[in-house]
């Protein structure tokens, strides 16, 4: 059977609805919708093993922030997006204690660079609190890591993060990475927040060891941005939307290639979203306004 690929819980929920019918209630899963700063947020809570089996994801809370309107560049679009991201981070992380932000991915591969780019916009304070307490004693200790990828470092991201967690003892790890979506309309237009952790490289089809509470011993907030669509999944959706017959999907099942589709202007989109996520994390962790974050990072 051809399986449509997605890393987004909201899309896994949609796929289940398509197969089971919208009149059937999905046991073990609760879905709610709201708006924050004018941006829609869909929350999918997987409550038990029945929900895990239905959606193929571990139990926990998955929140999808829809930033489609961000690209329309309306009034206050950046500040509102930063606060919307920050609000999710605030609600899903402890309100005190040191924080380790991990920018996962390959900076040299544009669709996979959202993690390192987000880390570039993080306000690093851990070393400053001890060095200049008169200026930074009121800040929360934050450190950042860009572990790179196994092919260029020879070290698994999970190994590097685990070693640093053992040394720093953070209250939470915030891991930012690229994801894969099933729909082009969600690429670079959504941000998923999950308290279940993340598998580095999943967005570009290069699964590595997981980063979660079980492997690191501390809570892990995963922040993911879909930057690619699996080509076979995209083709399957297009075939179905065109009302083509089921046998046409057999061609997709037999294709061995692993191809990804990404927007033409992915460079700019990833840079913009990396900054929004980095600023959102700063806004959530520090008692600062966006203008103050700008000044401190300049």
State the predicted function of each range:
Residues 60, 76, 80, 84, ...:
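Conserved active-site and cofactor/substrate-binding residues in soluble primary-metabolism enzymes
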Residues 50-94:
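An N-terminal, well-structured beta->alpha segment
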Residues 137-165, 169:
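A structural-propensity feature for long, helix-poor, extended segments
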Residues 104-112, 151, 178-182:
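Gly/Ser/Thr-rich loops at beta-strand to alpha-helix junctions
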Residues 106-140, 144:
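Glycine-rich phosphate/diphosphate-binding loop of Rossmann-like nucleotide-binding domains
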Residues 66-68, 98-109, 144-148:
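Short glycine-rich or small-residue beta-strand-to-loop segments that form or flank ligand, phosphate
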Residues 1-59:
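N-terminal amphipathic/basic leader segments beginning at the initiator methionine
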Residues 145-146, 175-298:
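A structural signal for small-residue-enriched, beta-sheet-centric alpha/beta enzyme cores
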């Amino acid at each position: 059977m051809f399986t449509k690929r997605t890393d987004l819980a909201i899309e896994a929920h949609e796929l289940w609805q398509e197969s089971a019918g919208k009149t059937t209630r999905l046991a073990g899963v609760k879905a709610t919708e709201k708006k924050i700063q004018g941006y829609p947020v869909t929350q999918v809570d997987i409550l038990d093993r029945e929900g895990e089996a239905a959606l193929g994801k571990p139990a926990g809370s998955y929140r999808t922030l829809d930033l489609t309107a961000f690209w329309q560049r309306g009034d206050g679009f950046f500040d509102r997006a930063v606060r919307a991201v920050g609000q999710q981070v605030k609600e899903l992380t402890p309100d005190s204690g040191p924080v380790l932000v991990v920018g996962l991915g390959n900076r040299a591969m544009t669709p996979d660079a959202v993690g390192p780019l987000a880390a570039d916009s993080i306000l690093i304070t851990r070393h400053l609190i001890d060095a200049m307490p008169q200026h930074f004693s009121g800040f929360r200790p934050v450190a950042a890591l860009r572990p790179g990828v196994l092919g260029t470092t020879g070290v698994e991201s999970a190994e590097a993060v685990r070693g640093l967690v053992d040394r720093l003892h953070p209250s939470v790890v915030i891991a930012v990475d690229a994801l894969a979506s099933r729909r082009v309309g969600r690429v670079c237009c959504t941000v998923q927040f999950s308290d279940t952790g993340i598998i580095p490289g999943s967005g570009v089809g290069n699964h590595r060891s997981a980063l979660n509470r079980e492997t690191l011993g501390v809570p892990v907030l995963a922040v993911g941005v879909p930057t690619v669509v699996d080509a076979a999944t995209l083709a399957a959706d297009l075939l179905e939307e065109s009302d083509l017959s089921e046998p046409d999907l057999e061609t997709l099942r037999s294709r061995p290639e692993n191809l990804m589709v990404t927007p033409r202007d992915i460079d700019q989109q990833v840079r913009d979203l990396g900054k929004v996520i980095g600023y959102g994390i700063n806004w959530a962790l520090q008692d600062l306004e966006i203008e103050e974050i700008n000044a401190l990072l300049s």
